[in-house]
Each structure stands twice: as C-alpha cells, then as structure tokens.
A protein has these predicted regions:
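Beta1/beta-strand and adjacent pyrophosphate-binding region of the FAD-binding site
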Residues: 2-14, 167-177
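Flexible, glycine-rich terminal cap/loop adjacent to redox cofactors
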Residues: 11-16, 20-38, 42, 49, ...
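Glycine-rich active-site loop/strand segments that organize a redox cofactor
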Residues: 52-87, 359-361
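Glycine-rich Rossmann-fold phosphate-binding loop(s) that bind the pyrophosphate
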Residues: 12-15, 36-37, 174-177, 207, ...
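Glycine-rich dinucleotide-binding loop and its adjacent helix/turn
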Residues: 48, 140-199, 222-226, 301-303, ...
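A Rossmann-like FAD-binding core segment of flavoenzymes
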Residues: 75, 109-112, 116-124, 131, ...
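FAD-site-proximal beta/loop scaffold in flavoenzymes
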Residues: 152-168, 279-355, 457
Length: 480
C-alpha cells in the first residue's frame, strides 16, 4: 500500500473545505489544508457575512424615516462609512481567527499559501514543497467576472466594495443577478445615488417571474434607478472624455491622461455610455456580472479531472471527479452556489470517503434568500417551471403590510404557493417581503417534507403577521 503524507489534502479554506477537513480529522484522518488568501472563503470574508452586515446598516435610513410616522422625534444624521468599515473589518478578522482555531483544534495542518494538484495524489505548495495525499478535495470557490472591454479595470467588483476608502455619491451597478440587486438596495439605503443597468428584460433571471416583477417594483420605490434592456457600451475616466478630441490620436490629445494602472475603485469619476445612448458620470462602477469557478492553474485537467466549459470541476453525485482520488465541492463545481450547500457537500464527502457510507448530495428543494430590498425567499419550483411539468394551481396575494400601511408607504408584499393539481403537494413557495429569508426557512421544511395545500390550510394562522397569508389563501388565482 502506498505511503502518503496525508489521508486528505484540502485545497481551499472556505466553509465547505474547512468543514470537510475538520470532520475528517475528528474521525482520525491525517488532514492538511491549504488556503492562499483568507480563511473563511467568499462567505465569511467577501460575501454572505459582510454583505448581510451592510444590509443591516442600510435599513436604518428607512427605519429612521418610518419612526417619525410612528410618533418618534428622530434627529437627522448621516451614515459614517469610516466607523462602520472599521468595525466590519474587525468582525471579519474575528471570524477568520475562529476558522483558523477550529482547524488547529481539530488537528488539521494548515498551509497559508497556494496549492496546486500535480497528479492523482500529488500537491505542490507555492513555496515549492511537494506533498502527497490518498485523497484530494478541491474547494477553491469562485470569483467575480469582469466584462472583457476597454476600461473594465476602472470598475470594482463585490470583492472590493467592502473596502472602499469612502462611499461614492453616485454609483452605477452593471448586472441583474442577486449580487447586483442586493448591492443596489444596500448602497441606496446608505445614501448613495444608485443607477442599475441590466441587459435582460427583467432582473433575477431564473427566479419566479411574478416575484421578479414585485422585487423590481419595490427596488424602484425605494430609490434605485433601475433600467432593464440596457448594458454598458463604453467607459473611461471622466478626465479623458472629450467628444471634440475623438478623432485625435490618444497621445496627441490636449486632455491626454496616462492609462490607469492603480487598484480598483480609485480611478476617480468615470464616464460611461449605455447601449441606449445615455452618457453619464459616476464616482464608482460596480460590475456584478456573474461569478466563475477558481480552477485556473490548479492542474486538475492534467491530473485526470474534467473541467467544464464554464471552468467548473465536473463531479458525480458523490462529488468525485473523473480522477478517482480527487473530489470537489462548493462553488468550484458550479452546482448550487450557496454556503450551506457547500457545507452539506463537505459532510457527504466525509461520509462517502472516510466513513464507508456512500452519501449522494441532495440538491433538491433547497430554500434560499436574496437580500434585496424588499427581501426575497424562495423554495421549490417557479410557476413557469411547474406549468411546464404538470397542471398546477397558483395561490397568490399581494398586499400592504400593516407596518408600512400605517406609515403611509406603498410597499407591497407577495405571498405565493404553486400547488400540484394531481398530488396537492406544494411544489414551490415564494415570498417578497421584509424578513422573507427568515420565513422561507420554515416554509422550506414543509415543502421538503412534501406538505400538501390542505396541510397548509390545517395550520392556524398567527395574527397579525405577514406570513399568516401562507395558510389563509383558499382560492387559486389561476390554474395552468
């Protein structure tokens, strides 16, 4: 039998890789983990956690305004980015330290440097050290995609937005996915004038159409200048833009400025032109145009693993690659890009490889939340997906919640159930409302268990709440 340095070598110190390493080590395996950036990965360092804290911060402007409608005397104030940013960075440092200590206390050997795969059982660290392992687990996550266009280096991505020196007065957000829409709400709430361009007909492609429309309406009501059917065509530093000089060679122009070579987010005012012909100047441009797996230069293909056309590692139901000793979990596989899913994939991997209990990963009926403003919670099929599969009944209601109605605001809540006519099972649940993420976690339990519409109906409503509508909708609004 071959003698390896480790039973398991994990590449990537995010949520999925860390969990797999810790659990395997707790079971007696010799485990090492390499992380080239910061422990905690996208979720803890530049994703879920800092974003949610920014969501919290951004909602206070609305709360202060609403408080006046409830009789409170509120002194006007301004958001202090410097103070918040300092505390945010301290919190991320604290959480990273927890991840490091959890690995250390589990007996996992840590290497704070890049690692690549050199063969079915081989790993090479950035310092040139070679290691071997019986099993290799790739959990390297993903990174933001920036459009391939001149001037793209002037914009920022979700990686940089948490570390801005100061908040911009005006920001353009490019994209219509969940990251773009979440930051549109965040920055608007923090007092930034936000314009959002998305090339598609409606934001949040892939989600329920009715919910998408409700979210877009809510975003516009809260101040986001949202334009669909619009994309960025050109951008440059405002100091370089002079229509009268377009025919003059760049270096001969009177307003010539050397190419920008500094860090993202510090280029100064940016002139942009849209596909609709609009020309505007913004302090910052945020590209939220998708994410791609971190597989470049890892050596996976040479080791026998298959890489897909989007750069993802191709795996089977047990997260095993085409190379039998190499597995992959999390965003690098481009299955479901959610932290809890990566953690479950890591746990299933340990059961399969180290506990001799082959455990396929269950990716069905995963609840999720989009922290837009208004918030969105969803589980199961969209109306469009369900209608293509079978005959369904749609139960939906849109209304003004008590809290906002009293304050005189035209905020709308959407509660929606998709029900199979044949089995009566609830195939999907979609909620657009403040706090929808908290609600959908519980609704997800019912949908996962196969609850029927009649099961929902048998539950007594909690009054007065928004979520009571989920158990009081008696008549379908349409069938299909």
């Amino acid at each position: 039998m071959a003698d390896f340095d480790y039973d398991l070598f994990v590449i990537g110190g995010g949520s999925g890789g860390t969990r797999a390493a810790r659990v395997a080590a707790a079971g007696g395996a010799r485990v090492a983990l390499a992380e080239e950036d910061r422990y905690g990965g996208t979720c803890v360092i530049r994703g879920c956690v800092p974003k949610k804290l920014m969501v919290f911060a951004s909602t206070y402007s609305e709360a202060f305004a609403e408080a006046r409608d409830y009789g409170w005397e509120v002194t006007s104030g301004a958001f202090q980015w410097d103070g918040f940013k300092t505390k945010l960075e301290g919190e991320l440092d604290r959480l990273e330290g927890i991840y490091q200590r959890l690995l250390d206390n589990s007996g996992v050997e840590r290497f704070s440097q890049r690692a690549i795969v050199t063969g079915a059982h081989g790993i090479e660290l950035a310092d040139g050290t070679a290691k071997t392992a019986k099993t290799i687990l790739v959990a390297t996550g993903g990174h933001p995609v920036v459009p391939d266009m001149p001037g793209a280096e002037l914009g920022i991505t979700s990686n940089e937005i948490f570390h801005l020196d100061e908040l911009p007065k005006k920001m353009l957000i490019i994209g219509g996915g969940y990251i773009a829409c979440e930051f549109a709400g965040i920055m608007t709430g923090l007092g930034v004038e936000v314009c959002q361009w998305y090339r598609g007909a409606q934001i949040l492609r892939g989600f329920d159409d009715e919910a998408r429309g409700a979210i877009a309406d809510g975003m516009r009501r809260r101040g986001v200048d949202l334009h669909t059917g619009t994309n960025i065509m050109e951008l440059k530093r405002a100091a370089e833009h002079d229509p009268d000089m377009d025919s003059v060679p760049i270096k001969d122009r009177t307003n010539y400025v050397p190419p920008y070579e500094g860090p993202r987010g510090k280029a100064g005012p940016i002139w942009v032109k849209s596909t609709t012909g609009a020309e505007m100047v913004f302090d910052q441009v945020l590209f939220a145009t998708g994410r791609t797996p971190n597989t470049d230069g890892l050596g996976l293909a040479s080791a026998g693993a298959e890489i897909g056309r989007r750069g993802e590692v191709i795996v089977d139901e047990y997260s095993r690659t085409a190379a039998p000793s190499i597995y992959a979990i999390g965003d690098v596989t481009n299955r479901i890009q959610l932290t809890p899913v990566a953690i479950r994939e890591g746990m299933a991997f340990v059961e399969t490889v180290f506990n001799d209990t082959p455990t396929p990963v269950d990716h069905d009926l995963v609840p999720s939340a989009v922290f837009t403003q208004p918030e969105f919670g969803t589980v199961g099929m969209t109306e469009e997906e369900a209608r293509d599969q079978e005959a369904v009944e749609i139960y939906a209601t849109s209304f003004r919640a008590m809290r906002q109605a009293f304050a005189g605001k035209d905020e709308r809540v959407l509660m929606k159930l998709i029900v199979s006519q044949a089995t009566r099972k609830v195939l999907g649940c979609h909620i657009v409302a403040d706090g929808a993420g908290e609600m959908i976690q519980l609704a997800g339990i019912a949908v996962k268990m196969g609850a029927t519409k009649e099961d929902f109906d048998r539950v007594c409503a909690v009054h007065p709440t928004m979520s009571e509508e989920l158990v009081t909708m008696k008549t379908p609004v349409r069938t299909a």
